[in-house]
Structure formats: C-alpha cells, structure tokens
A protein has these predicted regions:
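Extracellular adhesion/carbohydrate-binding repeat motifs centered on closely spaced tryptophans
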Residues: 1-182
C-alpha cells in the first residue's frame, strides 16, 4: 500500500492473514525490509543507504507482549558514510583506511584492495574504508531507492560519490568496502 503525506509517498506492507492480520510487518518480504510496515529505502538524493539491524532482548517492560526468549528487531538507516564509520567505531569493528594502506608495502595494499573487489590504484582513491573482519549481514546491509536490498556482487555509488562494494552473501549482500575516487 502507498500512502502520500505532504507530497511524499511511503510504501507499507500489512499482514494479510493470521493473528497479525492488518499489522505492519517488521522484517523481510520479497527482498525488501520493512519496519512497522514502512518500507526501508534510500532517499532519492542518497541513492543507497546502509541499514543497521538492531536486536533488543526481551525486558521487563515487554513481558506481556513478547513470548519467552523472543527479541525485538529494529532497522535503522544510517545517514551517510560518516554515520556508518561512527557506528563501526562504536561497535569495535576495525577497518583499514587509505592512510593504513599507504603505510604498507605496495603488494600488501594491492592485495587488500583486490580482496575487497576494488580494482583501482590506491593513488587514484581519495578515501577508502575496508573492514578488517567480515561484516555480518545480520548487522548491516545496503538498500537502494526502491527498497530492494543489494544482494549481488557490485559497486554502488551513493549521492555523495562514495562506492559501496558488496559481495553476494545469501539473501543480503555483504558490505566489504567503501571508497571514493579523486
């Protein structure tokens, strides 16, 4: 269902049957993710956005609404590359930067770039960020303006000229690097 509010269109998905009939879906349906029924998609200016998956454990305030051992999942769009890097920092996820790569031998830097599916020379990159460990697709994924999850091997340029390098990892692509060219 599409709803227009103040000239902006929002897509929603509501459960069609069962005990949750009419409730907004939180989760995946047809390669798209929804939060409380609202489609999660990148803004038209952004082109692509990283979505962070947050899981919250059951607590005393939710005892009546959640079954034993059930968690709540929420999807948060990160505004831009800076917000994504800040989130990685806050969660202790280390990544290589251009400065790190420049401090290595040419062969070592070239291998890291190649492993991250970046076929550019380091000198041609303005910025580069490559997680040192594989990011879990259960924690981060990339969506386009249609809301479709980027799930194939690709390089996806956002509205700020950053490329998100994605590798196929099941239903959700794994973000393996971010870079921008000079």
């Amino acid at each position: 269902n599409t709803v227009e509010i103040d000239g902006d269109k929002y897509n929603f998905y509501f459960e069609k049957s069962g005990g949750n009939k009419g409730a907004g879906l939180t989760g995946e349906k047809d390669d798209k993710y929804y939060q409380s029924g609202k489609l999660i998609k990148a803004g038209s200016d952004d082109k692509y956005q990283v979505v962070k998956v947050n899981t919250y454990a059951k607590n005393s305030d939710l005892d009546e609404t959640l079954a034993e051992g059930e968690d709540i999942t929420a999807y948060d769009k990160l505004d831009d590359v800076d917000a994504f890097l800040k989130d990685l920092d806050e969660n202790g996820i280390a990544y290589y930067t251009k400065t790190d790569l420049e401090g290595m031998t040419d062969a070592a830097a070239k291998k890291i770039l190649s492993d991250a599916n970046i076929n550019k020379k380091l000198a041609d990159l303005k910025e580069v960020y490559i997680p040192k460990t594989e990011l879990s697709t259960k924690e981060y994924f990339l969506v386009g303006t249609s809301g479709k999850v980027v799930d194939s091997k690709s390089r996806n340029k956002d509205g700020n000229d950053y490329y998100y390098v994605v590798e196929k990892a099941g239903k959700v692509g794994n973000i393996v690097a971010i870079y921008t060219e000079k």
